[in-house]
């Protein structure tokens, strides 16, 4: 066999070669974790799964953009997700903010991708997603053809790194003139029922296939992850998302790019890629199970303290501590986050210490820090 530079240079390159002996144990583990997570959600009643879904979708939207170097406003994303899910009535209106048009469009795209998992994927739908990513027709300062395939007018589509004079080409996508046929083949395969191919494996192959085609000027990574989410929703048998694959990809981004590049420069065996994909999916599910338990613990905390008096600042900060609070809680940080004085912040904190909600951290350093007490989360 004559070795080619990229996987798509081989004839019949999408006749994917996989080693089931390596993959089936990983598939079994992922399926077990999926079952645990969905079973856990079914046991939580009505509101807690909604909160878990809100958290997971918010995380997915933020992280799929962060992978591309774009930082979205979390509160705007969360508010947009709540409105699209129709659960904004469960939250204090003062905590919901108005999202930008761009954020609203991205949220809608991600939700539609999973919500319609039982419907065939179409090229028109992918075009609509692309337009949602770039509603102004610009990517940063550059005008792009939103909702249209790339035409390679300015040269071949390449994935590169490094600055001027030291550019490294990691990958070159198929030529633009091949895209209509290649995408038609991909979409036909994506929609075809294949009883012998587990849907978690199909999600991994779809991810590799679409990102290898790189059919647009920009946004290919986010579209790839939306397409992956759709197949994962089908594998779950549920449009409700409770875990974030993008968050786990971001956490191992260097490994992701490394295995992707080696696969795209290899032969047609994609076993190593699928091993990485399934392991990463398993990690995403495990993290979701941990977050879900945190959600349960938070609900139990508020139930135990249903007759305890807290002021609005304390309620806000306790919820932050149960959620995505980063770093150590200090009087200074409390004052800054609640927009109050240091004296008021200290009174708020001391009151929570007296009520057994907070304890002083053992290793506080130069300034005293606090954390939830052990019996607050048990």
Which residue stretches match the model-derived regions?
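FIC/Doc superfamily catalytic core
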Residues: 1-378
